[in-house]
Each structure stands twice: as structure tokens, then as C-alpha cells.
Swiss-Prot record:
Family: Belongs to the Wnt family.
GO terms (BP aspect): canonical Wnt signaling pathway; cartilage development; chondrocyte differentiation; embryonic forelimb morphogenesis; embryonic skeletal system morphogenesis; epithelial cell differentiation; negative regulation of cartilage development; negative regulation of chondrocyte differentiation
Known role: Ligand for members of the frizzled family of seven transmembrane receptors. Functions in the canonical Wnt/beta-catenin signaling pathway. Required for normal timing of IHH expression during embryonic bone development, normal chondrocyte maturation and for normal bone mineralization during embryonic bone development. Plays a redundant role in maintaining joint integrity.
Key words of the record: Developmental protein, Disulfide bond, Extracellular matrix, Glycoprotein, Lipoprotein, Secreted, Signal, Wnt signaling pathway
Keyword rRNA-binding attached: no
Cystine residue pairs: C93-C104, C141-C149, C151-C168, C215-C229, C217-C224, C299-C324, C313-C319, C323-C363, C339-C354, C341-C351, C346-C347
Disordered: annotated segments: 254-287
Record lineage: Eukaryota, Metazoa, Chordata, Craniata, Vertebrata
Cited InterPro entries: Wnt, Wnt9a, Wnt_C, Wnt_CS
Protein name: Protein Wnt-9a
Post-translational modification: Palmitoleoylation is required for efficient binding to frizzled receptors. Depalmitoleoylation leads to Wnt signaling pathway inhibition.
Length: 365
């Protein structure tokens, strides 16, 4: 589990985190963090092979559902983008929940149990997975790593000029269409599936809402005789923040859940919320996360998490909450870190090694 206060520190440490995608029931099409197979350590860059159809083998190694595998094989760049998307989603999930009792534990048995239930945490996993794929695919298009898509083709922007001047727009139109088809949708009679698909779409919509128009002026002496504009996605860290807020305000739609199967029964619309289309559909029209079941406390080890015993916490920030009232242990240790760094000509950084004493807080069992 990743336990750091700075995103950059553990982004580098978790470089190798990726996926195996699940082959579920024929009518299902789940992806990444919401698959039933365990996440597996693989390189972010798939090994190169001399064969012309090497990407076929890459798609097969991901163990996709039949339709997903067919879509993967259409373009040599898809397989690597899928791997990148899941890694990005997992890292962002763990970063957003680093101060919470549930810190996005992705070990196989905990995640498998969680996905059988319609918790808020489950809703977040669906949203962050679809958002990660949408973001990664749009970026792959604009970076030229895909054969079936290039830069954004927004009719209101001068993409020819944007491309000429190096301002290639992220192709959200292609990526969102691909993701909706890739994730698919089971029968509308399957209520749990409709909730999952709704949360998938929330992830896509948050990506769309974060698109910004970036412009650059060109002309003599800094004049703006020509202005080139292109569309650009928000950093994925911002997407994660928005989805975390939606997690915190997730709407519960009533359910009866079979403990053995995790299948949801009848659900009723949340009070005061407009129903969606489809005659009595309880899902909101607005892009809000929805869940079926109340979440456990995640305080003690169980089916859904390893609990919080031994978890590091910050005394002034979250020890009381994370430790669930059990208190925390304090350990003093001496650490050595680079300090007083200076750039020397040419071309290296010279640092002193400074020692300092720090206190580490961990939850009692």
C-alpha cells in the first residue's frame, strides 16, 4: 500500500503497478480496478516484439472480454494505453484516499469482496477507472501513439494551425466514444449493472467538464495577428479531486442485497431527486455518483479491508479518525535526507546530508 504525503514521491515508487483485466459474464464489460482478476505487477511499457502483429499478443496477455479484445486489436496503441490507464487510476485512487480509513486497498480478495457490494467506494472505483481510460486514450491520440485517431477535431478550433504550431488538442471525442463502447452495458433490467454503468459515465463526464481551451498568439514583436487554439484535458490529479468530492456526496438509492451473490434487488429513487429517463429510473440525471449499500467502517480487518491497525497517520490531521478511537503509538526515529542543495556548473546538483529526528504515528490494534 502506498503511504506518502506527496503524489510525486510515490508515483515514482509505484512505477510498475498495472493490471490484468477480467473476462466476466458474456454480457458484462468491466475494466481495470473493477475487474475480478487480481492486479498484477507488469511493466508499464509492454515488451517490443518484431512480429507485425505483436499487439495481438499484448491484447491477449491482458485477458480481456471478447468484445474488448477485438477493440484492443484494432489499434496497436490500445494495449499499452489500457495498461497506462489502470496504473494511473490506481495511483490516483490511493492518493485521494491516503488519509481515509479505506485507503483504496487493491489487494485481490479485498477488492473482489468490495466489488460484490454497491458501496460508495465501489462507485468511486468504477468512476476513476472509466475516467482514467478516457484521459489516457485522449492523450495517446494527441501524442501520436494511436493509428485510428489523431488530434482533436473540434470544428470551432483551427486544428490545422494548432498542429502546425505544436498545439495538438486532446481527442476527447474519440476517447469518450471508445470508452462507452469498451465498457459496454448489460441489460437495463439488471439494476446493479445500471448503477455501475451510471458511475462509469460520471467518470467520463468529469473528464469532459475539465476540458480547457488553450490559445497561443503569433505575430511580429509579440502581436497577436494569428491566434491558435486547441482543447486540452485537465491534469488527472484534478479529475481525482472532483471524483473524490462526488464520492463524499454520493447518493444512496435504496437496495436489498443478497449477501451471497452481491446482486441488488429493487431500488427506489432518492428523496428529492429527479428520476432519469426510462420510467421510474431512480438514477439521477446529473453526474453524481450513486451507491446501493452503506459502507462498513473499515476499522477492523474483514472481507473488505485489512483494517487500520498499524496504519501511519498524522497526529494533527487524521489519527483520531483513522484509528477509530483506539489511539495511536508514537515512535521517534532519526532520518537522513539531502539538504542545502546547490546546482554546480556544469551540470550536477550537490547536496549535504542532514539528519533530523522525527516522530512516526501508527494506529493501535
Amino acid at each position: 500500500m502506498l503511504d506518502g504525503s506527496l503524489l510525486a514521491r510515490w508515483l515514482a515508487a509505484a512505477f510498475g503497478l498495472t493490471l490484468l483485466l477480467a473476462a466476466l459474464r458474456p454480457s458484462a464489460a468491466y475494466f481495470g480496478l473493477t475487474g475480478s482478476e487480481p492486479l498484477t505487477i507488469l511493466p508499464l511499457t509492454l515488451e517490443t516484439e518484431a512480429a507485425a502483429q505483436a499487439h495481438y499478443k499484448a491484447c491477449d496477455r491482458l485477458k480481456l472480454e471478447r468484445k474488448q479484445r477485438r477493440m484492443c486489436r484494432r489499434d496497436p496503441g490500445v494495449a499499452e494505453t489500457l495498461v497506462e490507464a489502470v496504473s494511473m487510476s490506481a495511483l490516483e485512487c490511493q492518493y485521494q484516499f491516503r488519509f481515509e480509513r479505506w485507503n483504496c486497498t487493491l489487494e485481490g480478495r479485498y477488492r473482489a469482496s468490495l466489488l460484490k457490494r454497491g458501496f460508495k467506494e465501489t462507485a468511486f472505483l468504477y468512476a476513476i477507472s472509466s475516467a482514467g481510460l478516457t484521459h489516457a486514450l485522449a492523450k495517446a491520440c494527441s501524442a501520436g501513439r494511436m493509428e485510428r485517431c489523431t488530434c482533436d477535431e473540434a470544428p470551432d478550433l483551427e486544428n490545422r494551425e494548432a498542429w502546425q504550431w505544436g498545439g495538438c488538442g486532446d481527442n476527447l471525442k474519440y476517447s469518450s466514444k471508445f470508452v462507452k463502447e469498451f465498457l459496454g452495458r448489460r441489460s437495463s433490467k439488471d439494476l446493479r449493472a445500471r448503477v455501475d454503468f451510471h458511475n462509469n459515465l460520471v467518470g467520463v463526464k468529469v473528464i469532459k467538464a475539465g476540458v480547457e481551451t488553450t490559445c497561443k498568439c503569433h505575430g511580429v514583436s509579440g502581436s497577436c495577428t494569428v491566434r491558435t487554439c486547441w482543447r486540452q484535458l485537465a491534469p488527472f490529479h484534478e479529475v481525482g479531486k472532483h471524483l473524490k468530492h462526488k464520492y463524499e456526496t454520493s447518493l444512496k438509492v435504496g437496495s436489498t442485497t443478497n449477501e451471497a451473490t452481491g446482486e441488488a434487488g429493487a431500488i427506489s429513487p432518492p428523496r428529492g431527486r429527479a428520476s432519469g429517463s426510462g420510467g421510474g429510473d431512480p438514477l439521477p440525471r446529473t453526474p453524481e455518483l450513486v451507491h446501493l449499500d452503506d459502507s462498513p467502517s473499515f476499522c477492523l480487518a474483514g472481507r473488505f479491508s485489512p483494517g487500520t491497525a498499524g496504519r501511519r497517520c498524522h497526529r494533527e490531521k487524521n489519527c483520531e479518525s483513522i484509528c477509530c478511537g483506539r489511539g495511536h503509538n508514537t515512535q521517534s526515529r532519526v532520518v537522513t535526507r539531502p539538504c542545502q542543495c546547490q546546482v554546480r556548473w556544469c551540470c550536477y546538483v550537490e547536496c549535504r546530508q542532514c539528519t533530523q529526528r522525527e516522530e512516526v504515528y501508527t494506529c493501535k490494534g
